[in-house]
Amino acid sequence: MSHLSQQRIYSGENPFACKVCGKVFSHKSNLTEHEHFHTREKPFECNECGKAFSQKQYVIKHQNTHTGEKLFECNECGKSFSQKENLLTHQKIHTGEKPFECKDCGKAFIQKSNLIRHQRTHTGEKPFVCKECGKTFSGKSNLTEHEKIHIGEKPFKCSECGTAFGQKKYLIKHQNIHTGEKPYECNECGKAFSQRTSLIVHVRIHSGDKPYECNVCGKAFSQSSSLTVHVRSHTGEKPYGCNECGKAFSQFSTLALHLRIHTGKKPYQCSECGKAFSQKSHHIRHQKIHTH
């Protein structure tokens, strides 16, 4: 390190300023790397996978994902990480620290990125667009998972029955069928659920809370998924298309029912006469024949 560089560190002198945002640096090389943020230039490329970064420090951090090296270990639980900032974020789970709070509803988060994604539930912003069907998402990870519908990729397989899923969360939900575990119980009525999110939605039955409101007609819903489906009644969007006949649907569940026309699948069987049905509603209607 040169004598001049050392002097700047001790004096706190930062003579190099960014013309775009005004941020100052002690070295011109640091300013040059910073300016890549504004120009979106990514000159630092990973030799393993070709992924590019705006700063050298980020490509160095990224390369740890290929080596598998995890130098940073949590003192509480022993879990290790390839990057120090990932360890610091993880440690907040143990401390309960949630420094990033939503100004609209007060909900707090461990990570700033989670707060930004959450705030989109208030603004309705969905900047990530599927190139196949045009469906939009508030988070990039949601788009990535959705895209598996189009390519037919189902990498998450149940070890019990072999059923495969495009998204990990659906596999986890499915596995509770085999275990029967329902650890989340409602304090109001005692009803138990296998998933925490299901309990949260259920509690709204008692509270009457409907936080998701349609910007077009003002109708409110207890679940964001219900609002998403409802909005399609205004837009006419039908993102779920049948590969057999091309018919499109606004809900995935409706497409799943429709597919049984082509597959001939009839999972609902009458215990009285053995007649089978493709839809549960048809099965229930049929059973009334035997009760009358």
From Swiss-Prot:
Pfam families: zf-C2H2. It is found in: Nucleus. It comes from the Eukaryota. GO terms for biological process: regulation of DNA-templated transcription; regulation of transcription by RNA polymerase II. This is Zinc finger protein OZF. One of its GO terms (cellular component) is cytosol. Binds DNA. Interacts with SUMO conjugating enzyme UBC9/UBE2I. Interacts with the telomeric protein TERF2IP. It comes from Homo sapiens (Human). Its main location: nucleus. A zinc finger (C2H2-type) spans 16-38, 44-66, 72-94, 100-122, 128-150, 156-178, 184-206, 212-234, 240-262, 268-290. InterPro entries: Znf_C2H2_sf, Znf_C2H2_type. Liver, skeletal and heart muscle, mammary cells. Very low levels in brain, lung, placenta and kidney. Strongly overexpressed in many pancreas and colorectal cancers. Increased gene copy numbers are detected in 3 of 12 tumor cell lines and 2 of 12 primary pancreatic carcinomas. Overexpressed in 80% of colorectal cancers. There is a cross-link at residues 28, 51, 56, 173 (Glycyl lysine isopeptide (Lys-Gly) (interchain with G-Cter in SUMO2)). Sumoylated. Residues 212-292 are annotated as: Interaction with TERF2IP. GO terms for molecular function: DNA binding; DNA-binding transcription factor activity, RNA polymerase II-specific; heparin binding; RNA polymerase II cis-regulatory region sequence-specific DNA binding; zinc ion binding. Keywords: DNA-binding, Isopeptide bond, Metal-binding, Nucleus, Repeat, Ubl conjugation, Zinc, Zinc-finger. Belongs to the krueppel C2H2-type zinc-finger protein family. There is a cross-link at residues 157, 169 (Glycyl lysine isopeptide (Lys-Gly) (interchain with G-Cter in SUMO)).
